[in-house]
Amino acid sequence: MSQQENGDVATELIENRLSFSRIPRISLHVRDLSIVASKTNTTLVNTFSMDLPSGSVMAVMGGSGSGKTTLLNVLASKISGGLTHNGSIRYVLEDTGSEPNETEPKRAHLDGQDHPIQKHVIMAYLPQQDVLSPRLTCRETLKFAADLKLNSSERTKKLMVEQLIEELGLKDCADTLVGDNSHRGLSGGEKRRLSIGTQMISNPSIMFLDEPTTGLDAYSAFLVIKTLKKLAKEDGRTFIMSIHQPRSDILFLLDQVCILSKGNVVYCDKMDNTIPYFESIGYHVPQLVNPADYFIDLSSVDSRSDKEEAATQSRLNSLIDHWHDYERTHLQLQAESYISNATEIQIQNMTTRLPFWKQVTVLTRRNFKLNFSDYVTLISTFAEPLIIGTVCGWIYYKPDKSSIGGLRTTTACLYASTILQCYLYLLFDTYRLCEQDIALYDRERAEGSVTPLAFIVARKISLFLSDDFAMTMIFVSITYFMFGLEADARKFFYQFAVVFLCQLSCSGLSMLSVAVSRDFSKASLVGNMTFTVLSMGCGFFVNAKVMPVYVRWIKYIAFTWYSFGTLMSSTFTNSYCTTDNLDECLGNQILEVYGFPRNWITVPAVVLLCWSVGYFVVGAIILYLHKIDITLQNEVKSKQKKIKKKSPTGMKPEIQLLDDVYHQKDLEAEKGKNIHITIKLEDIDLRVIFSAPFSNWKEGNFHHETKEILQSVNAIFKPGMINAIMGPSGSGKSSLLNLISGRLKSSVFAKFDTSGSIMFNDIQVSELMFKNVCSYVSQDDDHLLAALTVKETLKYAAALRLHHLTEAERMERTDNLIRSLGLKHCENNIIGNEFVKGISGGEKRRVTMGVQLLNDPPILLLDEPTSGLDSFTSATILEILEKLCREQGKTIIITIHQPRSELFKRFGNVLLLAKSGRTAFNGSPDEMIAYFTELGYNCPSFTNVADFFLDLISVNTQNEQNEISSRARVEKILSAWKANMDNESLSPTPISEKQQYSQESFFTEYSEFVRKPANLVLAYIVNVKRQFTTTRRSFDSLMARIAQIPGLGVIFALFFAPVKHNYTSISNRLGLAQESTALYFVGMLGNLACYPTERDYFYEEYNDNVYGIAPFFLAYMTLELPLSALASVLYAVFTVLACGLPRTAGNFFATVYCSFIVTCCGEALGIMTNTFFERPGFVVNCISIILSIGTQMSGLMSLGMSRVLKGFNYLNPVGYTSMIIINFAFPGNLKLTCEDGGKNSDGTCEFANGHDVLVSYGLVRNTQKYLGIIVCVAIIYRLIAFFILKAKLEWIKW
């Protein structure tokens, strides 16, 4: 192959023609735009002006926090709250004439005819986060996006989807599921390209792209930008993107460049003028340096030392002044008069929208696809009513209707029919919405392709059969006959209709709750409190006739009152009669006591139907009004004064940091200074075996599929230098790091199979040994605690990882590390999450690195450490890593997508992987250049060597011809390396000849490097401090802990206060005692709001061997228990003192005690299920079933349970607490009147005092004994939770 043939692999390609219809051309004109954060009055972007004609590709460049994303958002009108802006932004429709001119390229013909110019102007926006459905394949995602955004024929849409798949290099993964953290699918780069495709499919005139190349390898990034350039040139589209690290050939594809630094414009003009402009002010781009990297370095402020910061800030100020002068004297912006006379288009009109019923059709089809591909949710959907119906039927199994207790049980089972199933569905559907559906809706709503009403209607249609109809039918079919209700078809189907409408109402309530807040802890609070009020108004717990007047009206707006009342009327009207006088029928008397009319059928059914529709209507209105937006970053003000410490002798802090690490008088450091570890991988293979249940009915229930991830990888990684693993997306780079660091985890449906050897200095080690001496920086930063600041995160990590140092030494090292990583400017900013914006993605990456750098390990693994970072920050991070290698002899291995050319030359060894994990090369950069030159692949001048090699090893799937030629090239390179390995006799050493470390010899040699966990007391104290800080800052967590329990007490007080001493008050006291079981659910919900984030952070710390399970568990309890105790005291104030139960010290403290214990048991159950399952939707479903069964078995609902169920009740805390509360509620000295009912024939009262009630209902218990037992039950719950966590992490390891 000649140099001419291979010289420019990236550009010698066959061009595709995309079948997009013509679009109107749009130009963008901005004048004096300034963007200010309204909360802090901080200027985020200062005086930005430009003219961008149609057919242009513009890039906004700059370091992290320079205002790139903010500028894009304002230009696209994506941020309204939290920001104010001055200046003008105008979109102008350019006059292109009715026919294309001769210079324009010819267009493809669709459906055999030439399409006219599209009338509707469309704008698209690619956000920084990829919001995709994990259970759709790549092709399905694009197909549904096309169906939602294009009003074209099926053939046209299919053609465009296939062309985009090829153009974006997604052909190899077109039928792969997108996946998520739990179920791996597409790589990060593939997801990014797919997101670009979902926006491009709408055929936009103007498109904004926020970091489109983040996570892409250099070759994929180049092809994506090349596609944008082609679309701009051919169709006159306008593309505006923010970009971190454009390779040099990407830079020269751009038409216009804007460089920002700290919100100030450093340059904003045509790309052709960029280099001459900087040369004119004295800055010449050095040879063999990417101009983009040079310009970003030039305009960045280096905050790693005071001296550097002052110098670079001064240079930046000079650059800004130069640009203002140039803009005023040389830049020729179009006159305002021209813009004013042109046709201006409002951005609100630049959205795509199908007719309503087409939206509904597409969304329904997608929902069906998603629902039936989610096996776990589908199974639980049908299992839940089956289990809960069976157990509920067993609890209330055919009660004796001739006794008072039996009739009370019958009433309770009717209440359970209306409330139980629909409440469980409310919780489940709320979580399913928060976890899966609403994020996709928010993205599509922001794009203008979906309306709230279409979303709600489509979702309801798709879930109607499986959820509303099937779940209700299963539940009613089981419970109706087990309850021993009348075998009448009309009554059976009427009960089905009532329960069906109740579940429909709860479905609407869940939609309303999520419309109010996308955060589950808030949405569940809305749903829970609403449902609690509605269940209180149903008339079962507190008699609807005698409710306090100020809440009596609630029954008329409570669908539960209508549903419970109509079932009571259907069951008891003219029933249990012993005489012809209907008024004396026991059933009619019960209806009279509860205040429901006889034969009350039609009206409540109609009202129920109205409520079921009404909740959805209110939810739709809130969704229309409440478009989700992200708030501006929050800053936590430090209480301490900021003391700037000057570096002695002007030494840079990162050098001081490195000196501190090993020059302190620490025995570990002195020993470790000279340890050098050469890592050798021999014949590493990795494959994953997928077991897909129910995927192919013909082949059986399970379908097995094997995927090769790594194949015979042999590599050497040397100490004292950075070793890089390079390759295109999907080549197994991250998988190799996970394998050698012992972080591969098999699941039920995906088993990893590995083989090969890992050597330390030619002696074989196990994965566990490797893990003990290495630190691993993962690609994912989601485990960071959102409520902590940067400084706090590193401070707490240092306290646990550097426990051999004094506090002053730890603080100094933390401060130095913050400066070294360039985080000084945001050290007091919170980390943030998807709901509250904190630091940028690049800054999160550096925080994660900082935590691991504190460990000071001999081996450091980093997965994509520069992904999402600007070139200046990337260079800074790699400079820090290089110093660690050089001065401390560490072995550092990184995976990297787009290394700068000057950094690539400084790498130690490079492992180049092709797709499917096959080795293309392993050696030094100089050896690499020489090797590929021998193969005939000479790197052209002014080309980044790393980019060139990545281009060589990448397969271009944009069209068949490109694919054939690129695959042949890749196969040739792979075959050549295999032959080279064989010739050099580098085959692996036979297993029998390998030296292997024993466990003892390894720990003897590397004992000073094996991380020793912090002692229990220290880890406990640090965990308490950290969790206290996160709880204090997180309003949601605090409210979940403190507000929900007293909130219930307030509601109970509203409905029950004052509890009287008459016949009706008996059922009210029973109801109030039964309502205390709701605290079981509150404990679980509090756990769901607080525990998962703490758990995820703890798992990372545990994997790093920082501390054990006990400190985390005890610290969590230390914060949880006092807050629960405080909430329980407030609860008792409302339920005992306000409601008017016996106001004695014994009753008050017994209520505090019982409510505290029940809440703690709910928390413990939450810990158990959150440990078993990491998927919260499944957790909610499982735990809700357990809790519901527990509350139904409390002993106050069903008064005649079987002996087996009574046996289960021994470990049911609410079984004990309900009995304690009811015995204190009916003391022997409580005198009852019977003017309103309950008189014997001789005129005496059936229940003269509290003891009579307890005896009659069989509720007399030894309260002292029960008070002792429930402590034991609570302790048993906690111990079970602890041992389940221990089993997960230490014993079984699932």
Curated annotation (Swiss-Prot):
GO biological process, one term: transmembrane transport
Subcellular location: Membrane
Keywords: ATP-binding, Glycoprotein, Membrane, Nucleotide-binding, Repeat, Transmembrane, Transmembrane helix, Transport
Cytoplasmic topology ranges: 397-495, 552-604, 1060-1120, 1288-1294
Domain named ABC transporter: residues: 28-287, 679-941
Keyword Secreted: no
Carbohydrate-modified residues: N41, N86, N101, N151, N341, N349, N371, N528, N983
Extracellular-facing ranges: 1-375, 517-530, 626-1038, 1142-1266
Main location: membrane
Family to which the UniProt record says this protein belongs: Belongs to the ABC transporter superfamily. ABCG family. PDR (TC 3.A.1.205) subfamily.
Gene Ontology cellular component terms for the protein in this record: cell periphery; fungal-type vacuole membrane; membrane
Annotated ATP 1 binding sites: G62, G63, S64, G65, S66, G67, K68, T69
Keyword presence, Plastid: no
Record-level Gene Ontology MF annotations: ABC-type transporter activity; ATP binding; ATP hydrolysis activity; ATPase-coupled transmembrane transporter activity
Lineage of origin: Eukaryota, Fungi, Dikarya, Ascomycota, Saccharomycotina
Protein name as annotated: Uncharacterized ABC transporter ATP-binding protein/permease YOL075C
Membrane topology value: Multi-pass membrane protein
TM ranges: 376-396, 496-516, 531-551, 605-625, 1039-1059, 1121-1141, 1267-1287
Residues binding ATP 2, per UniProt: G727, P728, S729, G730, S731, G732, K733, S734
Domain of life according to the entry: Eukaryota
PANTHER family the record matches: ABC TRANSPORTER G FAMILY MEMBER 28, ROA1P
